Design a protein with these regions (language model features):
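Bacterial Sec-dependent N-terminal signal peptides
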Residues: 1-28, 36-39, 423, 429, ...
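Short segments within alpha-helical structural elements
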Residues: 61, 206-231, 385-442
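Sec/SRP-type N-terminal targeting helices
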Residues: 43-47, 60, 107, 118-145, ...
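Outer-membrane beta-barrel architecture
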Residues: 57, 113, 277-280, 323
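Bacterial Sec-pathway N-terminal export signals of envelope proteins
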Residues: 20-72, 78, 233, 239-275, ...
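Periplasmic alpha-helical coiled-coil/stalk elements that build and connect Gram-negative outer-membrane
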Residues: 54, 147-258, 373
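Small/polar, glycine/serine/threonine/aspartate-rich low-complexity segments that form flexible
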Residues: 22-23, 70-112, 242-247, 292-326
Length: 444
């Protein structure tokens, strides 16, 4: 009894917990805002900006003082020899070279060295290039945001269209179910033939399968939307926007300039990077100037233990200086490199014309596709209304005994086909709207 009660309480808790999970309400704007915070591509693009910031700091660090400490303790188990004339060695035979070992069995060297760059043109150009690279990463982040907004918008519209399709399929299901029951009654009363019932039954079976398929397609569309949002698939959402024909009125607002396209802005940054790359090669012709200093102590002894006798065995040393490096001739290497980078800059300039022509063509194509899709949608909407009228009139005639069952079946098939054509046209118009707004840089 106790176990049964415990199981009942546990089950009740699970039910209450599931009921407590709220369904997330989302408009299209809320969906895009959510995606811009949670989509994995956006998160990776943000990390790229952090990497670029790290590159800037890394370049700054190379211009700061560099300090290093060194400690070297050695056991010279076999000292190298040098050859000296015998005149320097008392008691050695004259005219000969005498091998003499210099050094101690144990030696030590401890030092601290510091250096400071005073002038290096490559450093300053590299620092500027690193900041420009960060700017490029930021613009690529914007491009990722545009791509995500595009994907989310299309997925959001797909859910709305599939939802409307399912609602209409449900109405068709109820309508055909009613027609089937009426036809069966007419058959039982002798006012219809068996073939009339079979025809309606075929249509009813088809709409039953269509309803199941539409339900599954709506689930797939919702899963795709959650994927684009960066949301767990098992989280429940409800879309709050509704599809009306007014949604197509704002797609062609405003004027267009190439700067509105993030690809154009990215190309401008790439041009600056190419110019800085040329500048970097040019400054390699300039001298480099560095300051340096070192302070330490050395020791040499015949006993390893004496190396740790800092007071008596170690002797201080120190130095400071300035170092200038002047490039004189490198076999024309920098000249050849400079020519290559100028060619690459010319390629970037050519890409301006290529990108502008590509944008112009894309806008023209997307605008025509959008206008045509809206016209097609309006025509299919009118066809759907007309086919509905035809079906209703045909059904009334059949119920009044002046029409045939076959006419009703054909009118029903035409009506459902008109519905399918309209929803396909509606979805195509929505996608074309998103594509056109992206082409004119008005999506984000």
């Amino acid at each position: 009894m106790y176990k049964k009660t415990l199981f009942t309480l546990s089950l009740s808790f699970v039910v209450l917990f599931a009921a407590a999970q709220e369904v997330r309400q989302m408009s299209l704007q809320e969906a895009t805002d959510y995606a811009l915070e949670h989509n994995q591509n956006i998160l990776n693009a943000k990390l790229d900006i952090e990497v670029a910031e790290g590159v800037v700091k890394e370049n700054i660090a190379t211009g700061l003082p560099q300090i290093n400490a060194n400690l070297d303790l050695a056991y010279n188990f076999s000292l190298p020899v040098s050859f000296l004339p015998s005149e320097f060695i008392p008691g050695a035979p004259p005219g000969e070279q005498v091998a003499v070992a210099f050094g101690t069995k144990y030696s030590g060297n401890a030092s601290v060295g510091a250096s400071q760059m005073v002038f290096d043109g490559v450093f300053f150009v590299g620092l500027e290039a690193a900041k420009t690279y960060k700017e490029l990463s930021t613009k690529k982040h914007i491009k990722s945001k545009i791509d995500v907004v595009e994907a989310v918008s299309k997925a959001y519209y797909a859910v709305l269209v599939n939802k409307l399709t399912l609602e209409l399929v449900e109405k068709n299901y109820g309508r055909l179910d009613t027609l089937l029951q009426e036809t069966k009654e007419m058959y039982q009363n002798g006012f219809a033939e068996k073939i009339d019932v079979s025809r309606v039954q075929v249509q009813f079976n088809n709409i039953k399968v269509n309803r199941e398929n539409s339900t599954k397609m709506l689930g797939v569309a919702e899963s795709l939307l959650k994927f684009q949002l960066g949301m767990p698939i098992n989280e429940e959402i409800a879309l709050t926007d509704e599809l009306t024909l007014d949604i197509f009125d704002d797609a062609k607002e405003g004027s267009f300039g190439y700067e509105q396209r993030v690809e154009y802005s990215i190309l401008q940054t790439q041009e600056r990077l190419a110019l800085l790359d040329i500048k970097r090669t040019k400054v390699e012709y300039l001298p480099k100037l560095d300051l340096y200093a070192s302070l330490g102590a050395i020791a040499g002894t015949g006993s390893g233990a004496n190396l740790f006798n800092i007071g008596n065995e170690w002797f201080d040393f120190g130095l400071a200086g300035v170092k200038m490096s002047v490039p004189v001739f490198d076999g024309l290497r920098k000249h050849r490199v400079l020519q290559q980078k100028k060619v690459k800059l010319q390629q970037v300039h050519n890409n301006y014309d290529l990108l502008e022509n590509s944008i112009n063509l894309e806008i023209e194509q997307k605008q025509v596709a959008y206008e045509n899709s809206v016209k097609t949608m309006n025509v299919q909407l009118e066809n759907m209304k007309l086919s509905q009228e035809v079906y209703e009139i045909t059904k009334e005639k059949y119920q009044a005994g002046v029409g045939s069952n076959l006419e009703v079946i054909n009118a029903d098939a035409d009506y459902k086909q008109a519905q399918t054509n309209f929803f396909i046209a509606l979805y195509n118009a929505l996608i074309a709207k998103v594509d056109y707004k992206k082409s004119i840089g008005n999506l984000l």
